[in-house]
From Swiss-Prot:
Documented activity regulation: Repressed by 20-hydroxyecdysone.
Entries under PROSITE patterns matching the protein: URICASE
Protein function: Catalyzes the oxidation of uric acid to 5-hydroxyisourate, which is further processed to form (S)-allantoin.
Protein name: Uricase
Catalytic function, reaction form: urate + O2 + H2O = 5-hydroxyisourate + H2O2
Species annotation: Drosophila melanogaster
Active site: K41, T86, H308
Tagged with keyword tRNA processing: no
GO cellular component: peroxisome
GO terms of molecular function: urate oxidase activity
Gene: Uro
């Protein structure tokens, strides 16, 4: 299944249609019923190249398509007459990419989900998951050649590789920059006029060396951690949000906006930073600002594991390294604290 499943069976809302239970080969009903089902194709990898003259653009996706059929006869009787083969679903990904192009994970997922619902009347629900590979255009200054401290013959432009001009972008060369993963989930149900569009950020790893504290927490017989007035704060952010309105929405710009908001609330001003009294507070400020800035977002969920960096104790080694140590730390990724919260506008029903 998908890394981020959207829907879980809800027993309270589940209504079993009459005669939905399976029949055996003698026409007698089984004593069990299928309460959830579906099938699909996962890990379909596609690269789309947009060739606009000499300037090319690329999108590389990993796509999963899952369908839920009205009928369960493929399970109960082994009757495959309603099955849209997973190989056909794979082909659909490539053919729609060829026919319509690829602009963003969300738009492509919506295109695929609508296709399955519109083309196959026996499909009850279509769920599409897309993960975007983080390619960025190479800066021209990164392609200059330097030999023995001098520019190679025939190479024009600045050969100072310590300074990269981000405005000079290469026409057709790209570099893989896995800072964070952009993914989305789209669910369209034939009986529900509202489509579900969820976008997410996965694996955004950040660290700051000061302006983080953790003090005045519960002090009892189980506590061993002292108050920390200045510590290293590092986390790997996973975040997802649901759109209530996608009309004329620039999905790529919205995703970048959320990412920038998270980084800004974590890091603060480049010169002075921002104080983080707890991971919880930083997380909440990020979520609140997303809802303030993007009215199309109805609910946002975020997880921030606390990746610890502990001071190496130099006290037993004063002859070798005298004085206090605030420069050498031991990274400890396990065990780690995990902080999460979901922030929603009032009176919102979410699929997060």
């Amino acid at each position: 299944m998908f890394a981020t499943p959207l829907r879980q069976p809800a027993a309270a809302n589940h209504q079993t249609p009459k005669n939905s239970a399976g029949m055996d080969e003698h026409g007698k009903p089984y004593q069990y019923e299928i309460t959830d089902h579906g099938y699909g194709k996962d890990a379909v990898k596609v690269l789309h190249v947009s060739r606009n003259g000499p300037v090319h653009a690329i999108q590389e996706f990993e796509v999963g398509t899952h369908l839920k059929l009205y009928s369960k006869k493929d399970y109960y009787q082994g009757n495959n007459s309603d099955i849209v083969a997973t190989d056909s679903q794979k082909n659909t990904v490539y053919l729609l990419a060829k026919k319509h192009g690829i602009e963003s994970p969300e738009k492509f997922a919506l295109l695929l989900a609508r296709h399955f619902i519109n083309k196959y009347s026996h499909v009850e629900e279509a769920h599409v998951h897309v993960e975007a590979y983080p390619w960025q255009r190479v800066c021209q200054e990164e392609t200059r050649t330097n030999v023995n401290g001098k520019c190679e013959n025939g190479v024009q432009g600045n050969c100072d590789f310590s300074s990269i001009d981000n405005r000079s972008l290469h026409n057709h060369a790209f570099i893989f920059t896995p800072t964070a993963l952009h993914y989305c989930d789209v669910v369209i149900r034939r009986t529900d006029p509202k489509q579900t569009v969820i976008t997410g950020i996965k694996g955004l790893r950040v660290l700051k060396t000061t302006q983080s504290s953790f003090v005045n927490f519960v002090n009892d017989e189980f506590r061993s951690l002292p108050d920390q007035y200045d510590r290293i704060f590092s986390t790997v952010v996973d975040c997802s949000w649901e759109y209530s309105d996608t009309e004329n929405l620039d999905f790529l710009r919205a995703w970048q906006t959320v990412k920038n908001i998270i980084i800004r609330n974590f890091a603060g001003d480049p010169q002075v930073g921002v104080s983080s009294p707890s991971v919880q507070h930083t997380l909440y400020l990020s979520e609140r600002q997303v809802l303030d800035v993007l009215p199309q977002v109805s609910v946002i969920s975020m997880t921030m594991p606390n990746k610890h960096y502990f001071n190496f104790d130099t006290k037993p080694f004063q002859k070798i390294a005298p004085g206090d140590n605030n420069e050498v730390f031991i990274p400890v990724d396990k065990p780690h604290g995990t902080i999460y919260a979901q922030l929603a506008r009032k009176n919102i029903n979410s699929h997060l």
